[in-house]
From Swiss-Prot:
Activity regulation remarks: Allosterically activated by GTP, when glutamine is the substrate; GTP has no effect on the reaction when ammonia is the substrate. The allosteric effector GTP functions by stabilizing the protein conformation that binds the tetrahedral intermediate(s) formed during glutamine hydrolysis. Inhibited by the product CTP, via allosteric rather than competitive inhibition.
Entry-linked SUPFAM superfamilies: Class I glutamine amidotransferase-like, P-loop containing nucleoside triphosphate hydrolases
Protein source organism: Streptococcus equi subsp. zooepidemicus (strain H70)
Domain Glutamine amidotransferase type-1 intervals: 292-535
Catalytic reactions on record: UTP + L-glutamine + ATP + H2O = CTP + L-glutamate + ADP + phosphate + 2 H(+); L-glutamine + H2O = L-glutamate + NH4(+); UTP + NH4(+) + ATP = CTP + ADP + phosphate + 2 H(+)
Keyword Cytoplasm found: no
UniProt: Mg(2+) binding residues: D71, E141
Positions of ATP binding: S14, I15, G16, K17, G18, I19, D71, R240, D241, V242
Name of the protein in question: CTP synthase
Length: 537
């Protein structure tokens, strides 16, 4: 029988529900259980694919092409699993599916209501996420906080699950903030008490409290919360601020969180062996070197817009025993005149993805600086496309070269819209999304990075591709197309082999990086950056 764990939040948002859920998932996986995890987002968008990065942060793409919440990145990195489209559910997605069924007459003339139709659809998504992965345990995080009007149908569905599958198969974990008032010199439990009262008013009695705090929590405070919130004292778990996120699973295990969960759900499984994870954390906290990477982006005011990029850089830094020092460079501010000032101290330059005209000229200048000064450079998605544009302009003499996306009237459309995208009008869910194969060119930098594999599978999110009309011109000038689709039609990786490292990929390699298994192309880039720093000392 599948076990269901539901993680809710109270008092304030952004208190780390996703990290708690992911950490618990890692502990249960290390007990030998097959775990999957999903996020409920109560907003009305179908998915975050068309949302501004300033509103939502990055869009995380799964193997099967779902555009999802960035928390799924945390889930995959912590638990080391690949999730699917059932792992992110929004209000908009549920309502659109229910309304589509109503239009088809599938409800046989019934009045369509929140209960039972919306709640039934939500419960079906929970169960589908478990069955499609054949999981022993599914952890479902509900976005937002208890008391938000948008969350009510989701919480009602969670309440009903207890009756549907049995109380011994369901566990409710409530995460809250425990504020510390310096003036009073004490922690305040009232916000948590009121949050639990609100949750209980909706018919959900939490079985565990996870309290987010900056300071150590005395047992007396835990006992008080246990008494007023009607949970066992040992089930009041402290989630204190840490230096590195990957410490959190170990901290939770030290408080027997996973054992309490297993006892409640009647799971008779061995203790979690966290030896390898602990060794990884110890290494992360004792890195001997540093390397400086300039990240040139258009959304740098909100680092969450590049969350997976940053995490992938860190993972590859761990593999090189190096901490990554990031210089956040706003592409809008970068010009040919100030490129040396902004980029001159960098050991490596990364140009990540994006959409639209703004900031593209600055990114092109960053790529040009990397090429002309032989600074290791990695381009991702739009960064790959602009790598081609930069080469066309400044090496091939095509001064007005551009992407069709950025200038439909350009005489040199180096990057063109994909043929199957030409007549598409909807913006959401219509990109080339998900896992696709990339055939590697033997002897190339890309092939070396991937241990000379012939084909790798990587996740994509784009609508435009390199225009093959110009391929011969590029190759004649020494530009290497080191990764292509199996039919040779789509360019996936480009490089200049004579440089220290000058490689750009159309796909998003960062989405498959893990702390204990860094993505290979990122690792090759960071290795080159570390070497570049050593050479310049």
């Amino acid at each position: 029988m599948t076990k269901y764990i539901f993680v809710t939040g109270g008092v304030v948002s952004s208190i780390g529900k996703g990290i708690v859920a992911a950490s618990l998932g890692r502990l249960l996986k290390n007990r030998g259980l097959k775990v999957t995890i999903q996020k409920f987002d109560p907003y009305i968008n179908i998915d975050p694919g068309t949302m501004s990065p300033y509103q939502h942060g990055e869009v995380y793409v799964t193997d099967d092409g779902a555009e999802t919440d960035l928390d799924l990145g945390h889930y995959e990195r912590f638990i080391d699993i690949n999730l699917n489209k059932y792992s992110n559910v929004t209000t908009g997605k549920i309502y659109s599916e229910v309304l589509r069924k109503e239009r088809k007459g599938e409800y046989l003339g019934a009045t369509v209501q929140v209960i039972p139709h919306i709640t039934d659809a939500l419960k079906e998504k929970i169960k589908r996420a478990a069955t499609t992965t054949d999981s022993d345990v599914i952890i479902t995080e509900v976005g937002g906080t208890v008391g938000d009007i948008e969350s009510l149908p989701f919480l009602e569905a969670l309440r009903q699950m207890k009756a549907d599958v049995g109380s011994e198969n369901v566990m409710y974990i409530h995460t809250t903030l425990l504020p510390y008032l310096k003036a009073a010199g004490e922690m305040k439990t009232k916000p948590t008490q009121h949050s639990v009262k609100e949750l209980r008013g909706l018919g959900i009695q939490p079985n565990m409290l996870v309290i987010r705090t900056e300071e150590p929590v005395e047992q007396g405070i835990k006992n008080k919360l246990a008494q007023f919130c009607d949970v066992n004292p040992e089930a009041v778990i402290e989630s204190r601020d840490v230096e590195h996120l990957y410490q959190i699973p170990l901290n939770l295990q030290a408080q027997s969180m996973d054992q309490i969960v297993c006892d409640h759900l009647k799971l008779d499984v061995p203790q979690a062996d966290m030896t390898e994870w602990s060794a990884m954390v110890d290494k992360v906290m004792n890195l001997k070197k540093t390397t400086r990477i300039a990240l040139v982006g258009k959304y740098v005011e909100l680092p969450d817009a590049y969350l997976s990029v940053v995490e992938a850089l860190k993972h590859s830094g761990y593999a090189n025993d190096a901490a990554i020092e990031l210089d956040w460079i706003n592409a809008n501010d970068l010009t040919a005149e100030n490129a040396k000032k902004l980029l001159g101290q960098a050991d490596g330059i990364i140009v990540p993805g994006g959409f639209g005209q703004r900031g593209t000229e600055g990114k092109i200048q960053a790529i040009r600086y990397a090429r002309e000064h032989d600074v290791p450079m990695l381009g991702i998605c739009l960064g790959m496309q602009l790598t081609c544009v930069e080469f066309a302009r400044h090496v091939l003499g095509m001064e007005k070269a551009n992407s069709f996306e950025l200038d439909p009237d350009t005489a040199y459309p180096i990057i063109d819209i994909m043929r199957d995208q030409i007549d598409i009008e909807d913006m959401g869910g219509t990109l080339r999304l998900g896992l696709y194969p990339c055939k590697l060119k033997a002897g190339s930098r890309a092939a070396a990075a991937y241990n000379n594999q012939e084909v790798v599978q990587r996740r994509h999110r784009h609508r435009y591709e390199f225009n093959n009309k110009f391929r011969q011109d590029f190759e004649a000038a020494g530009f290497v197309f080191s990764g292509v689709s199996p039919d040779n039609r789509l360019v996936e990786i480009v490089e200049l082999p004579e440089k220290k490292f000058f490689v750009a990929a159309q796909y998003h390699p960062e989405l498959q990086s893990r702390p204990n298994r860094p993505e290979e192309l990122y690792t090759a880039f960071v290795t080159a950056a570390v070497k570049n720093k050593n050479q310049s000392l």
